[in-house]
Protein backbone atom coordinates (compact mmCIF):
# COMPACT_ATOMS: atom_id res chain seq x y z
CA UNK A 1 0.00 0.00 0.00
CA UNK A 2 1.32 3.45 -0.88
CA UNK A 3 0.34 6.90 0.28
CA UNK A 4 0.54 9.47 -2.49
CA UNK A 5 0.54 12.63 -0.35
CA UNK A 6 1.26 13.33 3.31
CA UNK A 7 -0.88 15.09 5.89
CA UNK A 8 0.92 17.33 8.41
CA UNK A 9 -0.58 18.64 11.64
CA UNK A 10 -0.57 22.38 12.46
CA UNK A 11 -2.45 24.61 14.86
CA UNK A 12 -4.09 27.92 13.99
CA UNK A 13 -3.74 30.10 17.12
CA UNK A 14 -0.65 30.51 19.32
CA UNK A 15 -2.58 29.83 22.52
CA UNK A 16 -3.73 26.43 21.21
CA UNK A 17 -0.35 24.68 21.14
CA UNK A 18 -0.83 22.43 24.19
CA UNK A 19 -4.24 21.23 23.07
CA UNK A 20 -2.94 20.80 19.52
CA UNK A 21 -0.05 18.58 20.63
CA UNK A 22 -2.49 16.34 22.47
CA UNK A 23 -4.81 16.07 19.48
CA UNK A 24 -1.97 15.37 17.04
CA UNK A 25 -1.00 12.31 19.11
CA UNK A 26 -4.61 11.27 19.43
CA UNK A 27 -5.17 11.25 15.66
CA UNK A 28 -1.66 10.05 14.80
CA UNK A 29 -0.44 12.93 12.63
CA UNK A 30 3.06 14.52 12.74
CA UNK A 31 3.03 17.76 14.77
CA UNK A 32 4.59 20.59 12.73
CA UNK A 33 3.84 23.75 14.70
CA UNK A 34 1.95 26.93 13.90
CA UNK A 35 0.19 27.16 10.53
CA UNK A 36 1.62 29.67 8.05
CA UNK A 37 0.40 30.56 4.58
CA UNK A 38 3.94 30.42 3.13
CA UNK A 39 4.60 26.78 3.99
CA UNK A 40 4.35 25.89 0.30
CA UNK A 41 7.84 27.37 -0.09
CA UNK A 42 9.32 24.52 1.96
CA UNK A 43 10.00 21.33 0.00
CA UNK A 44 9.00 19.17 2.96
CA UNK A 45 5.44 20.50 2.86
CA UNK A 46 4.93 21.67 -0.73
CA UNK A 47 2.04 19.99 -2.56
CA UNK A 48 1.04 17.97 0.49
CA UNK A 49 -1.79 18.73 2.94
CA UNK A 50 -2.06 20.50 6.28
CA UNK A 51 -4.49 19.46 9.01
CA UNK A 52 -5.12 22.75 10.84
CA UNK A 53 -6.35 22.33 14.39
CA UNK A 54 -8.65 25.00 15.82
CA UNK A 55 -10.72 24.79 18.98
CA UNK A 56 -13.69 26.17 17.05
CA UNK A 57 -13.38 23.93 13.95
CA UNK A 58 -10.49 22.00 12.45
CA UNK A 59 -10.01 21.65 8.71
CA UNK A 60 -7.59 20.57 5.98
CA UNK A 61 -5.91 22.69 3.31
CA UNK A 62 -3.63 21.81 0.40
CA UNK A 63 -0.18 23.28 1.05
CA UNK A 64 0.18 25.23 -2.16
CA UNK A 65 0.48 28.82 -3.33
CA UNK A 66 -3.06 28.90 -4.69
CA UNK A 67 -5.61 29.71 -2.01
CA UNK A 68 -8.48 27.24 -1.72
CA UNK A 69 -11.46 26.75 0.54
CA UNK A 70 -10.91 24.58 3.62
CA UNK A 71 -11.91 20.92 3.53
CA UNK A 72 -14.02 20.03 6.54
CA UNK A 73 -17.07 18.06 7.55
CA UNK A 74 -20.08 20.30 7.10
CA UNK A 75 -23.65 19.10 6.73
CA UNK A 76 -26.41 20.94 4.86
CA UNK A 77 -29.78 21.58 6.40
CA UNK A 78 -31.64 18.27 6.43
CA UNK A 79 -34.71 20.12 5.15
CA UNK A 80 -32.87 20.65 1.84
CA UNK A 81 -32.52 16.91 1.19
CA UNK A 82 -34.98 15.62 -1.38
CA UNK A 83 -37.10 12.65 -0.43
CA UNK A 84 -36.48 11.15 -3.87
CA UNK A 85 -32.68 10.91 -4.07
CA UNK A 86 -31.32 7.70 -5.54
CA UNK A 87 -29.71 6.80 -2.22
CA UNK A 88 -33.07 7.03 -0.46
CA UNK A 89 -34.67 5.11 -3.33
CA UNK A 90 -32.18 2.33 -2.68
CA UNK A 91 -33.66 2.13 0.84
CA UNK A 92 -37.23 1.69 -0.42
CA UNK A 93 -39.15 -0.79 1.71
CA UNK A 94 -36.86 -0.39 4.72
CA UNK A 95 -38.64 0.46 7.97
CA UNK A 96 -37.84 3.82 9.57
CA UNK A 97 -36.98 1.89 12.74
CA UNK A 98 -34.43 -0.32 10.95
CA UNK A 99 -30.90 -0.65 12.30
CA UNK A 100 -28.54 0.87 9.71
CA UNK A 101 -24.74 0.88 9.51
CA UNK A 102 -22.57 3.12 7.35
CA UNK A 103 -19.48 0.91 7.41
CA UNK A 104 -17.22 3.37 5.52
CA UNK A 105 -18.00 6.70 7.19
CA UNK A 106 -15.66 9.14 5.45
CA UNK A 107 -17.08 12.66 5.75
CA UNK A 108 -20.54 11.36 6.60
CA UNK A 109 -22.52 12.96 3.76
CA UNK A 110 -24.36 9.78 2.80
CA UNK A 111 -25.03 8.81 6.42
CA UNK A 112 -26.51 12.25 7.01
CA UNK A 113 -28.80 11.82 4.01
CA UNK A 114 -30.01 8.46 5.34
CA UNK A 115 -30.45 9.86 8.86
CA UNK A 116 -32.69 12.61 7.48
CA UNK A 117 -35.37 9.98 6.78
CA UNK A 118 -34.58 7.16 9.23
CA UNK A 119 -34.58 7.06 13.01
CA UNK A 120 -30.94 6.12 13.54
CA UNK A 121 -27.74 5.17 11.78
CA UNK A 122 -24.40 4.09 13.17
CA UNK A 123 -21.33 5.46 11.38
CA UNK A 124 -18.02 3.64 11.64
CA UNK A 125 -14.75 5.30 10.59
CA UNK A 126 -11.39 3.64 11.24
CA UNK A 127 -9.01 6.50 10.34
CA UNK A 128 -8.46 8.71 13.43
CA UNK A 129 -8.11 12.09 11.68
CA UNK A 130 -11.13 11.47 9.44
CA UNK A 131 -13.09 10.39 12.52
CA UNK A 132 -12.03 13.62 14.28
CA UNK A 133 -13.30 15.86 11.46
CA UNK A 134 -16.53 13.89 11.26
CA UNK A 135 -17.00 14.12 15.03
CA UNK A 136 -16.66 17.90 14.85
CA UNK A 137 -19.21 18.06 12.04
CA UNK A 138 -21.72 16.04 14.06
CA UNK A 139 -20.98 18.19 17.12
CA UNK A 140 -21.82 21.37 15.24
CA UNK A 141 -24.88 19.74 13.74
CA UNK A 142 -26.17 18.89 17.23
CA UNK A 143 -26.02 22.57 18.16
CA UNK A 144 -28.43 23.54 15.40
CA UNK A 145 -32.18 23.58 15.67
CA UNK A 146 -33.97 20.64 14.09
CA UNK A 147 -31.12 18.39 15.20
CA UNK A 148 -30.85 14.87 13.84
CA UNK A 149 -30.29 12.86 17.00
CA UNK A 150 -29.98 9.50 15.27
CA UNK A 151 -26.34 9.82 14.18
CA UNK A 152 -23.99 7.57 16.19
CA UNK A 153 -20.25 7.62 15.48
CA UNK A 154 -17.54 5.12 16.43
CA UNK A 155 -13.79 4.99 15.78
CA UNK A 156 -13.49 1.38 14.73
CA UNK A 157 -12.76 -0.99 11.86
CA UNK A 158 -16.17 -2.06 10.62
CA UNK A 159 -15.06 -5.66 10.08
CA UNK A 160 -14.40 -5.87 13.83
CA UNK A 161 -17.84 -4.45 14.58
CA UNK A 162 -19.58 -6.85 12.20
CA UNK A 163 -17.88 -9.81 13.83
CA UNK A 164 -20.14 -9.20 16.82
CA UNK A 165 -23.13 -7.22 15.52
CA UNK A 166 -25.63 -7.43 12.68
CA UNK A 167 -27.77 -4.73 11.09
CA UNK A 168 -30.84 -4.57 8.89
CA UNK A 169 -29.04 -2.43 6.29
CA UNK A 170 -25.31 -2.01 5.70
CA UNK A 171 -24.04 0.79 3.44
CA UNK A 172 -20.62 0.67 1.77
CA UNK A 173 -18.78 3.34 -0.19
CA UNK A 174 -15.47 1.76 -1.32
CA UNK A 175 -14.16 4.96 -2.89
CA UNK A 176 -10.55 3.85 -3.29
CA UNK A 177 -10.72 3.27 -7.03
CA UNK A 178 -7.86 4.67 -9.05
CA UNK A 179 -9.47 4.18 -12.47
CA UNK A 180 -11.35 7.46 -12.34
CA UNK A 181 -9.89 10.79 -13.35
CA UNK A 182 -8.98 13.30 -10.67
CA UNK A 183 -11.45 15.79 -12.14
CA UNK A 184 -14.29 13.40 -11.32
CA UNK A 185 -13.61 13.58 -7.58
CA UNK A 186 -14.68 16.32 -5.19
CA UNK A 187 -12.04 17.91 -2.95
CA UNK A 188 -12.91 15.90 0.15
CA UNK A 189 -12.88 12.61 -1.74
CA UNK A 190 -9.63 13.55 -3.47
CA UNK A 191 -8.10 14.28 -0.06
CA UNK A 192 -8.98 10.80 1.17
CA UNK A 193 -7.67 9.18 -2.00
CA UNK A 194 -4.37 11.05 -1.81
CA UNK A 195 -3.68 10.83 1.93
CA UNK A 196 -4.82 7.31 2.77
CA UNK A 197 -3.25 4.06 1.57
CA UNK A 198 -4.69 2.40 -1.50
CA UNK A 199 -6.91 -0.30 -0.14
CA UNK A 200 -9.76 -2.34 -1.44
CA UNK A 201 -12.17 -3.38 1.31
CA UNK A 202 -13.23 -6.40 -0.70
CA UNK A 203 -13.52 -8.55 2.38
CA UNK A 204 -15.90 -6.01 3.86
CA UNK A 205 -18.53 -6.77 1.22
CA UNK A 206 -18.43 -10.46 2.09
CA UNK A 207 -18.68 -9.70 5.81
CA UNK A 208 -21.53 -7.27 5.18
CA UNK A 209 -23.48 -9.81 3.13
CA UNK A 210 -23.22 -12.24 6.03
CA UNK A 211 -24.23 -9.64 8.63
CA UNK A 212 -27.06 -7.70 6.94
CA UNK A 213 -30.57 -8.93 7.66
CA UNK A 214 -32.26 -7.01 4.82
CA UNK A 215 -29.80 -5.58 2.29
CA UNK A 216 -26.32 -4.29 1.54
CA UNK A 217 -26.03 -1.10 -0.53
CA UNK A 218 -22.77 -0.42 -2.38
CA UNK A 219 -22.01 2.99 -3.88
CA UNK A 220 -20.08 2.82 -7.15
CA UNK A 221 -19.25 4.93 -10.18
CA UNK A 222 -21.27 3.75 -13.21
CA UNK A 223 -18.05 3.07 -15.12
CA UNK A 224 -16.79 0.59 -12.53
CA UNK A 225 -17.48 -3.12 -12.38
CA UNK A 226 -19.55 -4.63 -9.61
CA UNK A 227 -17.54 -4.99 -6.41
CA UNK A 228 -15.86 -8.43 -6.40
CA UNK A 229 -17.73 -9.08 -9.64
CA UNK A 230 -20.85 -9.86 -7.63
CA UNK A 231 -24.00 -8.93 -9.49
CA UNK A 232 -26.56 -7.17 -7.25
CA UNK A 233 -30.27 -7.87 -7.18
CA UNK A 234 -30.79 -4.46 -8.77
CA UNK A 235 -29.08 -1.11 -9.26
CA UNK A 236 -30.16 2.52 -9.27
CA UNK A 237 -27.98 4.56 -11.61
CA UNK A 238 -27.40 8.22 -12.42
CA UNK A 239 -24.69 9.90 -14.48
CA UNK A 240 -22.10 9.88 -11.69
CA UNK A 241 -23.29 7.33 -9.13
CA UNK A 242 -24.61 3.78 -9.15
CA UNK A 243 -26.12 2.14 -6.08
CA UNK A 244 -25.91 -1.65 -6.17
CA UNK A 245 -28.46 -3.29 -3.88
CA UNK A 246 -27.86 -6.81 -2.58
CA UNK A 247 -30.88 -8.34 -0.84
CA UNK A 248 -29.95 -10.72 1.97
What are these regions (language model features)?
Residues 1-99, 116, 124-169:
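S-adenosyl-L-methionine
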Residues 97, 167-170, 213:
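Local beta-strand N-terminus motif with an aromatic residue
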Residues 99, 119-122, 214-215:
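Residues at the starts of beta-strands that form the adenosine-phosphate
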Residues 103:
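Conserved beta-strand/loop positions that form the S-adenosyl-L-methionine
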Residues 107-119:
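Conserved SAM-binding loop of SAM-dependent methyltransferases across substrates and taxa
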Residues 174-204:
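Mobile active-site "lid"/loop adjacent to the S-adenosyl-L-methionine
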Residues 201-247:
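Conserved Class I SAM-dependent methyltransferase catalytic core
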Amino acid sequence: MTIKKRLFFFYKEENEELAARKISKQIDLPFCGLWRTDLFKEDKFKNHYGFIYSASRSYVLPIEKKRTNPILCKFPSHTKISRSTNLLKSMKGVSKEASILDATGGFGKDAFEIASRYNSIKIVEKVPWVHYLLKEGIRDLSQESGVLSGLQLELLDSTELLANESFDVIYLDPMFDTKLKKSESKKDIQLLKECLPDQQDNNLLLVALESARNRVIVKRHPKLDYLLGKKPNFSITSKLIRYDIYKT
